[in-house]
């Protein structure tokens, strides 16, 4: 009996099959699939989020805690502000140390922000004043905004100077410094701090790097 000849796949068919397989795997493992936008970048457990490395709409960090329900050495602008537990605990240690150094009056104004909430913020903001949904660090639950009651601007206060000198000791970095806007893509934000852990924060403090540089790329 004559054997059936196997139909050979053409090169184009093999490429298409491979591409479909990669897409299916990306979906199955939650890797994200954005055209023109890379998946978020990690170094160890440090997460990079910016316009080029976005979070999925359904990303919610583990162990979010409501700061109003926790003991805290700082004031809150709202009773609904949340952060990851690890970030909150490091922040509480930091502001407790500030309090002992007679640096009082810190007011935390923002923390975790969902993808959907960021959509609202983006829609209500002037162009260039807010990150697009998925590109905001607030969605990680590891970033917060802080200020004090002053008419001079937070960056002109002793509380700001104390943070700049000591934040890294508790694992925090000022995420968007004035001299790195060309790398971060974000204008100077003296009020915005991000938890990355003591080792990474200390190294960035010593070298003057921002997160994009520390993780090995500018976006």
Which residue stretches match the model-derived regions?
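Extracytoplasmic cell-surface/polysaccharide-interacting catalytic and binding patches
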Residues: 2-111, 115-219
């Amino acid at each position: 009996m004559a054997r059936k000849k196997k139909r050979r796949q053409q090169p184009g068919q093999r490429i298409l099959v491979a591409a479909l397989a990669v897409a299916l795997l990306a979906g199955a493992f939650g890797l994200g699939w954005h055209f023109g936008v890379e998946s978020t970048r990690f170094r160890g457990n440090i997460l990079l989020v910016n316009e080029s490395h976005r979070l999925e709409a359904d990303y919610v960090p583990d162990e979010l805690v409501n700061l109003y329900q926790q003991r805290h050495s700082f004031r809150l602008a709202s009773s609904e502000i949340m952060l990851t537990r690890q970030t909150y605990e490091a922040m509480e240690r930091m502001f407790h140390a500030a309090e002992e150094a007679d640096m009082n009056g810190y007011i935390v104004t923002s923390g975790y922000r969902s993808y959907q909430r960021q959509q609202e913020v983006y829609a209500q903001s002037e162009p260039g004043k807010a990150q697009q949904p998925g590109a905001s660090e607030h969605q990680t639950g590891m970033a917060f905004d802080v200020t004090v009651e002053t008419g001079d601007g937070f960056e002109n206060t002793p509380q700001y100077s104390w943070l700049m000198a000591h934040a890294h000791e508790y694992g925090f970095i000022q995420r968007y410094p004035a001299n790195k806007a060309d790398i971060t893509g974000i204008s100077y934000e003296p009020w915005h701090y991000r938890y990355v852990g003591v080792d990474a924060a200390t190294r960035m403090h010593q070298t003057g790097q921002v997160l994009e540089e520390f993780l090995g790329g500018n976006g």
